[in-house]
């Protein structure tokens, strides 16, 4: 079981680069890259909220549960 963060998919849909998202959200490119590559073990709700606002999406569009 795993929760996948589909950040790369949503960024591609919005035609947004990592550095642009980093500036909008206020998170380092390194930390966003960890989320994007699936290496993150956790994400704060405040971070998730900021990413969703910047990408104009819902949390369910970013997160996917795989059994």
How would you describe each model-predicted region?
Residues 11, 22, 52:
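The alpha-helix within a helix-turn-helix
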Residues 39-50:
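Short, basic-rich loop-to-helix N-cap that marks the start of a DNA-contacting helix
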Residues 1-16:
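A short, Lys/Arg-rich alpha-helix, primarily the initiator
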